Amino acid sequence: MEKPWSGRFKEETDKFVEDFTESVSFDKELAFEDIEQDIAHVKTLQKAGILTEEEARELIQELLKIKEEIKEGKFQWKKELEDVHMNIEAELINRLGDVGRKLHTARSRNDQVATDEKLYLKKEIKEVLQLLKELRKTLVELAETTVDFVMPSYTHLQRAQPIRVAHYFLAYREILLKDSERLMDTYRRVDELPLGSGAVAGVDFPLDRFYTAELLGFNRVTRNSMYATAERDFIIEFLSNCALIAQHLSRLAEDLIIWNTEEFNFVELPDKLCTGSSIMPQKKNPDVLELIRGKTGRIYGNLIALLTTMKALPMAYNRDMQEDKEPLFDTLKNLKNMIKGMTLVLSDLRVKEQNMRKASGNFLLITDIANYLVEKGVPFRTAHHIAGSIVAYLLEKGKKLEEMTLEEFKQFSEKFEEDVFDILSPERAADRKRVYGGTAKEEILRIIEVAKAEEGL
């Protein structure tokens, strides 16, 4: 089959080269964006007087037919034509002859593919943002149902201080909100039209690039043709955002996996989202959460792969950049499933509030003892030392903090009074954290209302 660039060559392309260099097996994912761009390019060529009205009409008509054939799975992709762009153009030439041969006027595959990818990424960013919004809504709804429950917070995976369970879920809602803000910021940089930059230096024809941008829904036009065709920073930035989102989902998954163990027994996952063992009949494995955690490494790998591909390329376009698509497509497929999976898990999560509360007393209240002494006029560092001495005493005696008598408290400081027992409750300890952003119930209820308004609940 004759190649679109075959005029300079005297030999046919080796079969190995065709197989090794083809990208249509994966870049056909961009087919609809490529056709959308083709149609806008046709209209721009007509506006510039390069195509007649009739030629433009014929091209657009056939492009729309090809789009339907692709939708229906009837379009025949040929790897010997290398990529999605040449497959569609070759079919136009097959149907329209010389009119089809005019389509690629004032365009290179270099600015064409960058435009396709930006169109694709704009659409996909919006989809990821919507999935994140659904996950955040689920977290807010979960917070509403757990606002009266208390649990231990952890630092170094050691019990720290009592918090309301809702505070935990709202923390992840804040994290995912920042993820969405980063994606929206990335979208702003993606929203820039490369088409009209040609291979590297621009084009010789009087194209109205701002008209093309308007047709394709781009807010801005690239200001340098080399930059427009040489960079894949917009994909790398997006993959970096995805890696952060994956990291956050992985950390949440890790907590839920631990909480689901018999040793913690804080939550129970629904049967429909777990699997069993081929040998151990008792097993109920949290596979969805484990794969969310596992696929995070894959998403990191895709980011590192593209960073490494781009790190030493001479200016401007190089064929190495063909390797940007598979990491992008793979990351999107897996990240979207990870978000959907986490939303499903949280939507049907059973929180075991009694077990959480049982784990929230004793030494988790010792910081409140130190703060109690501070309120009685004891310097904090002294109060901290006294509270630490109480811990050592209780460990030696094999007692819990709640079992101490007033006489025992007074052995450590005369500042202790009967009211010390008022703070020996996980709920009261949590509710003393009334600072803005703290874990007090009144503050959590306020934040829930703010979150519901922001999420449209």
From Swiss-Prot:
The gene coding this protein: argH
EC number: 4.3.2.1
GO molecular function, one term: argininosuccinate lyase activity
Lineage of origin: Bacteria, Pseudomonadati, Aquificota, Aquificia, Aquificales
Associated pathway: Amino-acid biosynthesis; L-arginine biosynthesis; L-arginine from L-ornithine and carbamoyl phosphate: step 3/3
UniProt entry keywords in alphabetical sequence: Amino-acid biosynthesis, Arginine biosynthesis, Cytoplasm, Lyase
Catalytic activity: 2-(N(omega)-L-arginino)succinate = fumarate + L-arginine
Annotated GO CC locations: cytosol
InterPro entries in alphabetical order: Arg_succ_lyase_C, Argininosuccinate_lyase, Fumarase/histidase_N, Fumarate_lyase_CS, Fumarate_lyase_fam, Fumarate_lyase_N, L-Aspartase-like
Stated name of the protein: Argininosuccinate lyase
Short name of one Pfam family: ASL_C2
Alphabetical list of NCBIfam families matching this protein: argH
